[in-house]
């Protein structure tokens, strides 16, 4: 790993082969979204979902990827508002495939393409900016289970059968 690893105030959940990195100010719902995604994985709404870390994670560059790890002191712990700190299954690392920015000041109804990409240590990663007061869960599930619209329309109407991209690195650009 590179020397430029950093500790950041964020949560992360591995879904399938990639992690969703959830950033935002204190109280913006990072832990709640992480827990909701884990439960969505258990319910089969998204691929299997496992906590990487909650509240504080470490990011490091590995080639052209960003790897996220839990802070050692917080590994396997998640805050559930109203219940406190709880133990949770976790993985020791995952490659970041999607970034969700909560309370993002640049969130728009139809964001321009450049708003749907972020750059961490020189690595471009698909991004979902979520405005303050908006529910991030449906946006993240949609990003994980649907593909970007194009001139050809799939009339089957079934977003979950075989055509979802499940955190494809081209999620925001494809």
Predicted regions located by residue number:
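Short acidic/polar mixed-charge low-complexity motifs
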Residues: 18-20, 74, 122-123
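Extreme N-terminal, non-catalytic leader segments
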Residues: 1-23, 172-174
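Conserved NTP phosphate-binding and transfer environment spanning the P-loop NTPase/kinase superfamily
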Residues: 92-174
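Conserved nucleotide-sensing/catalytic segment adjacent to the nucleotide-binding pocket
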Residues: 44-101
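A short, compositionally biased
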Residues: 7-9, 53-54, 112
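Solvent-exposed alpha-helices and their adjacent loops that cap or buttress functional pockets
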Residues: 5, 14, 43-44, 90-93, ...
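Glycine-rich phosphate-binding P-loop
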Residues: 18-43
């Amino acid at each position: 790993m590179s020397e430029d690893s950093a500790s950041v105030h964020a949560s992360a959940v591995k879904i399938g082969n990639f992690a969703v990195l959830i950033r935002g100010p204190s109280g913006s719902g990072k832990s709640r979204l992480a827990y909701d995604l884990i439960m969505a994985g258990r319910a089969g709404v998204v691929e299997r979902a496992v906590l990487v870390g909650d509240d504080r994670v470490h990011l490091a560059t590995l080639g052209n990827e960003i790897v996220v790890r839990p802070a050692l002191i917080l590994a396997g712990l998640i805050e559930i508002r109203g219940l406190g700190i709880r133990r949770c299954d976790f993985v020791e690392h995952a490659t970041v495939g999607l970034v969700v920015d909560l309370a993002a000041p640049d969130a728009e109804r139809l964001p321009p393409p450049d708003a749907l990409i972020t750059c961490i240590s020189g690595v471009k990663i698909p991004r979902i900016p979520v405005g303050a007061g908006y529910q991030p869960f449906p946006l993240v599930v949609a990003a994980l289970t649907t593909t970007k619209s194009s001139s050809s329309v799939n009339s089957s109407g079934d977003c979950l059968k075989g055509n979802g991209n499940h955190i494809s690195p081209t999620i925001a650009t494809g």
